[in-house]
Amino acid sequence: MQLIVRKEYLNELIELYGTPDIKVITGIRRSGKSVLLQEFVSYLQSLEEAVNIVMINLQELEFDHLLEYHALHKYILDQYKEGMTNVLLVDEVQLCPQFELAINSIYTKGIYDIYITGSNAFLLSSDLATLFTGRTMEIKVYPFSFVEYLTYYGITDRYDEAFDQYVRTGGMPGSYVYKTEDRQYDYVRDVYSTILIRDLVEKYKIRNKSEFTNISEFMMDNIGNLLSPNNISKTLKNDQSEITRKTVSKYIGYLENAFLFYEAKRYDLKGKKYLANNSKYYLCDTSFRYAVNGTRNMDFGRVYENIVCLELRRRGYEVYVGKLYKKEVDFVAKKREAQIYIQVSDNISDEKTFEREYSPLLAIRDAYPKMIIARTHHETYDYKGVQVVDICRWLRE
């Protein structure tokens, strides 16, 4: 498999090198966390200073004896070298039960610069503060962006064709070694099955696997739609599946914990407040939708929405769904003091469709940038202060 340097993530690690924080690399299975760690090791090896690199991959058989936290702790201490910068990197740390006891003990000694990776529900953003005694810095790794997809395949022109393929096959890098779409979808389905069964069903001791799977697939089919545990429960009950609102809420949380779905909460633009009821959920990668639910209903509008949402998150934005009276804005993207309003569409060549997209933006009475991202196949242009940009072009900016 060809490897590419994911510069944005690598630069994050380089910026954090030497800081006292525990650096935690999180993300969905097979999104490239282990490869990122290897890239960082290569960077450390290129330094002129004396660096003692202690690299432990708990998936590898040679480290099988470290799957007990006392043994892991002793091994790390034994590898320490005086007079050098000692860097500890533990890949798939969750495979060692109670790993946090070993890592916390090492951290309190102040002798290692610590980096760890973990998949899915075992290293949650919300749990980092309670797992570790020290301050943590989280590096969130996503599947390949469109730019990374282009880099992997060495594509420097005919971007529209490449985008069409990216929409269908997504950004799971492990699938790229397979030459046919069917084989790529087989790979993605296997990753999905591992997440649901090995990670979530086993971790949370879910008894009704089919019920859990149904909710996941329902959410996949409804990316870009407003959902709540209550309306999901009612819909599934109509399909003769008895499931409570509380159970649905719990299952959605599990799927988010596994980085399979990301929530976009609603934000009231007039009242300047976040709304608790109804959210939208977007997949970590659109390939899961097609691999699991099939390609009969491509529904490009919502798929483009999903791609834009994930790209905004990659670029460091918090993403919300805007509400202005009875109108809806697809995304309110916030980053520190910056804010952007975005509408996403597959096709705005029809006048009524175009009006439906721009009218909510024109109703917003502030000076923040407003944008329509669509499949225009044209140069970027301005309409009444709203920037209209082709999605393929925007993803490459």
Residue ranges and their predicted role:
Residues 4-18:
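Pre-Walker A adenine-sensing motif
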Residues 25:
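Hydrophobic anchor at the beta1->P-loop junction of P-loop NTPases
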Residues 54-84:
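Short glycine-rich substrate-engagement loop in P-loop NTPases that contacts/grips substrate
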